[in-house]
Amino acid sequence: MKKNKPGFTLIELLVVIAIIGLLSTLSIIALNQARARSRDARRLADVKQIQTALEMYFNDKGSYPTSTTPGASIASGTTIYMDIVPKPPTPADYTGCGNSAYTYTVTLVNSLASSYQLQYCLGSNTAGIPAGLNTATPSGVGLRSVQ
C-alpha cells in the first residue's frame, strides 16, 4: 500500500499563484491612481502658491509681473516673492491639454499688468475643479478654460 506524502497538488499551487497575481495587479492599479491624484493635488497647490506670490507682488507694485517662467523666480529688485516658480509634476495625466506646463499671461491696461491668467491642467476632478485645462485668475483657481 502506498502512503500519501503531505504536500500541495499542482491545482492548489496554480490557484494560489493566480490569487497572488490578481491581488498584485489590483494593488498596482490602486497605486497608480493614488499617484495621479497626488500629482493633481501638487498641481493645484503649485497654482495656489504662484497666485499668492503674484498677489504679494501686486500689493507691493500695483501691477502683476509681465512674465513668469517655471524654474525662474518672481522677484523685483531685492524682494523675492517666490524663489522658484514650480514646474508641473510629470507625467501629464490628461492628454487633452497639449503642453502641460503652467502658462501665465497678463492683461495690460495703460501699460500696467492689471490682471493675469494662469492656465494649468488636471488629470481628474480635484477639489471640485474639473479635469482638463483650467484657468486661475485673481478671482480664483477653478475657472474652466474656453478651448
Which residue stretches match the model-derived regions?
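Low-complexity, S/T/G/P-rich flexible repeat/linker segments used as non-globular hinges
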Residues: 130-147
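Short, surface-exposed beta-strand/loop "edge" segments at domain boundaries and coil↔beta transitions
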Residues: 124-130
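Aliphatic-rich helix starts adjacent to a transmembrane/signal segment
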Residues: 28-48
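N-terminal single-pass transmembrane signal-anchor helix
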Residues: 2-31
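Extracellular/periplasmic head regions of type IV pilus-like filament subunits
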Residues: 52-124, 146
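A generic fold-level signal
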Residues: 5, 42, 110-113
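Regular, well-ordered alpha-helical segments
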Residues: 25-28, 36, 52, 56-59
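Conserved catalytic core of two-component sensor histidine kinases
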Residues: 17, 44, 51
